[in-house]
Curated annotation (Swiss-Prot):
HAMAP family: UPF0212. InterPro entries: UPF0212. This is UPF0212 protein PYRAB08340. Belongs to the UPF0212 family. The lineage of its organism: Archaea, Methanobacteriati, Methanobacteriota, Thermococci, Thermococcales. It holds the Pfam family DUF555. It comes from Pyrococcus abyssi (strain GE5 / Orsay).
Amino acid sequence: MGDYIVVLEAPIIVKDVESVEEAIEAAVNKVMTALEKEKLDFVRVELGYSKCPVCGAHFESAFVVGNIGLVGIYLTLKVFNAQSLEHAERIAKAVVGKALKKVPLKLFEIRELHDGREENNGIEAGENETNA
């Protein structure tokens, strides 16, 4: 059994926005509201970044076309007592998926925690787990 930090990537679509900044704000608010409804205040929400295939520079994953915005969001949470990396991923997707229904979640990064200095605010294996 191990403890993991799992980072999921989610594409969020927002409507009636005119700028990238407005799209980012609307997407973050949409995600935060959904997470708060499910009492998932331990999930950290961050703006995603994409890498330019030509120069390698990173830029914000937010695009606006025709007043529709697509924003990449990273969702980070700790998963405790998971049996494996894959188990931790399934738990994270199940927990976040309850709040973000119909939003595809992709694993961005997963790290095993080795030191006990991390704070205990996350989800424990078996707690709130559904079929993912």
